[in-house]
């Protein structure tokens, strides 16, 4: 009984060799993709396509650029960007802004897609001179434009220059939590905070205050031991924010302090953004 079925599949494969070739090509490309180091993506990249739509060559070439603490670019209308932390094959953006010129489509649609992409903590994969940024909703394909090396200015057009290096030490600092996984709603919208002491931290993202210990290794927070919590009494959607907050801190996340009082903490699946408390 099985022989006719086998023969049927063989016949279908023989009738559609192009589909097989495309599938093999997709598998091969996926096998070649790697998680790049920061130095592998630093620099300027030409935007090849956005969500499968190829961008035609123009006088003002669409591009994205990356530095150690920012990302930005243009698709022919506004310049846009923001403070960004790259770690573990993903990019976390603190905020995304730029020029305020009204753009006709398709540039307007492209700008919206790129903004949504960076707000969604996209994955980054490298294959030769090609870079792919992917979120659940959007995919941007890039091609290396200028080789490796530092840029002559920040990719973030909104960056306010500061004369000194920004300290990454978190001890004895207090932050207002701005968003967790892009979610700004909370059962405690006024009291959301994250405080670091010499060896301990505490934070309120939504319902319960979490407590734990930590140490720094470079730009990583190593959270050891249990994470304690006050009593949680809120609806499931708000309680989920507390769960995400705890998972983030257990990930031994990377962190970045920006020049204008910004904070990004990024783990495997979750991202917290905040601003220095005033």
Model-derived features: positions:
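Lipid interaction determinants
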Residues: 15-278
């Amino acid at each position: 009984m099985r022989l006719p079925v086998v023969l049927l599949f063989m016949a279908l494969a023989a009738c559609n060799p192009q589909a097989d070739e495309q599938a093999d090509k997709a598998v091969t490309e996926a096998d070649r993709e790697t998680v790049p180091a920061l130095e592998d993506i630093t620099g300027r990249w030409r935007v090849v396509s956005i969500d499968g739509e190829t961008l035609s060559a123009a006088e003002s070439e669409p591009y994205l650029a990356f530095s150690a603490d920012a990302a930005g670019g243009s698709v022919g209308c506004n310049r846009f960007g923001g403070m960004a932390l790259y770690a573990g094959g993903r990019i976390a953006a603190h905020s995304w802004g730029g020029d305020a010129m009204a753009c006709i489509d398709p540039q307007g649609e492209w700008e919206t897609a790129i903004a949504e992409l960076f707000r969604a903590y996209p994955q980054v994969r490298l294959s030769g001179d090609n870079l792919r940024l992917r979120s659940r909703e959007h995919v941007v394909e890039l091609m290396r434009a200028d080789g490796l090396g530092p840029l002559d200015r920040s990719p973030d057009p909104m960056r306010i220059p500061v004369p000194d290096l920004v300290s990454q030490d978190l001890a004895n600092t207090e932050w207002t939590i701005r968003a967790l996984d892009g979610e700004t709603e909370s059962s405690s919208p006024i009291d959301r905070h994250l405080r670091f002491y010499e060896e301990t931290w505490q934070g309120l993202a939504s319902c319960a205050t979490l407590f734990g210990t930590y140490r720094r290794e470079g730009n990583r927070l190593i959270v050891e031991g249990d994470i304690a919590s006050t009593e949680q009494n809120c609806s499931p959607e708000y309680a989920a924010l507390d769960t995400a907050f705890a998972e983030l801190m257990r990930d031994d996340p990377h962190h970045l302090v920006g020049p204008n009082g910004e904070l990004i903490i990024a783990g495997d699946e979750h991202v917290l953004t905040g601003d220095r408390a005033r």
